């Protein structure tokens, strides 16, 4: 059957598939346009399966809120290359999926994938994008925040977006909320405050802080003992340095062995007799510093470093606070 260029172009406009793929589909389906569309869809599904082991690390991350700011969503639509990820059609598709979530206040990723747009599920439309772009395309994330007021921030380039939910709507909240959403994008907090940090993370940070404190106290004692023996601690702080400095003639083999013995004995003695309360005091200080650096409300405000984010919010309204936030980034 003779397939015309007009037929090929029409199918291409309808599906976004490549010219040669459209021509092949029409030939295989004897010019039947609807059958050719199904053929291309099936091909897209096969492409998706064939590319299942490919990494889809590029794409678009975009957020938005409802007009009343009580619901916000951020999606991540992934592909393989920045070229496709920055393509207007790809970004447009991502925005379309996001708008569906916003308009219908969709709660989770599975519900969004199953949602129908013009008779097609979002999951099918994502598969179509695989056929259209020739790359593995995945809808990986839908994060949602519902609160009395939700602010969003989209970083330039569609690679990073945030949502921040507040416990109340107050006069002038737009500017304050936007600044906090920008802060969350820039400073990468892991939790709202200390109470929001998972217990597993708290336990891990405390264990690290305790061990680090003990080792530092032992090292201080070792350094004092080495100096008393006439050995520069910097020359013997590792086996590599010991061997290197012996080769340079900076220390003798006897000094190297003496340093090893001092390190072993003083470390063991220090750890055996260390004051646990002192260790816990220092470790608690380190964990508190971790909270200040990683919890949104306790971080120094990006706009005014003289106050925390909590203080920045309460400057606008004493009763206002953050009740939820999401931060999604490519990579």
Identify the function of each model-found stretch.
Residues 2-331:
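N-terminal assembly/interaction segments in proteins that build large macromolecular machines
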């Amino acid at each position: 059957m003779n397939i015309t260029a007009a037929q090929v172009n029409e199918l291409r406009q309808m599906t976004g598939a490549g010219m040669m793929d459209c021509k092949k589909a029409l030939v295989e389906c004897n010019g039947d346009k609807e059958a050719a569309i199904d053929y291309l869809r099936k091909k897209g599904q096969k492409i998706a399966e064939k590319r299942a082991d490919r990494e889809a690390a590029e794409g678009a991350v975009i957020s938005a809120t409802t007009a009343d700011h009580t619901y916000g969503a951020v999606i991540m639509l992934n592909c393989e290359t920045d070229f496709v990820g920055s393509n207007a059609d790809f970004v447009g598709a991502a925005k379309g999926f996001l708008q569906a979530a916003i308009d219908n206040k969709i709660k989770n990723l599975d519900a969004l994938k199953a949602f129908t747009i013009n008779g097609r599920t979002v999951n099918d439309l994502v598969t179509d994008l695989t056929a259209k772009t020739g790359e593995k395309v995945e809808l990986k994330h839908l994060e949602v925040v519902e609160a009395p007021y939700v602010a969003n921030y989209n970083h330039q380039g569609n690679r990073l977006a945030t949502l921040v939910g507040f416990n109340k709507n107050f006069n002038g909240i737009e500017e304050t909320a936007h600044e906090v959403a920008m802060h969350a994008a820039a400073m990468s907090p892991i939790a709202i405050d200390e109470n929001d940090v998972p217990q597993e993370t708290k336990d891990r940070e405390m264990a690290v802080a305790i061990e680090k404190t003990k080792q530092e106290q032992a090292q201080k004692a070792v350094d004092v003992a080495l100096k008393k023996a006439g050995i520069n601690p910097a020359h013997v702080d590792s086996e590599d340095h010991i061997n290197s400095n012996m080769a340079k003639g900076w220390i003798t083999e006897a000094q190297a062995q003496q340093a090893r013995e001092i390190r072993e004995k003083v470390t063991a003695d220090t750890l055996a007799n260390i004051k646990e309360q002192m260790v816990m005091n220092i470790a608690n200080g380190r964990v508190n510093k971790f909270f200040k650096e990683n919890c949104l409300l306790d971080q120094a405000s990006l706009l005014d470093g003289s106050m925390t984010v909590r203080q920045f919010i309460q400057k606008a309204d004493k009763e206002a606070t953050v009740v939820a936030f999401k931060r999604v980034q490519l990579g």
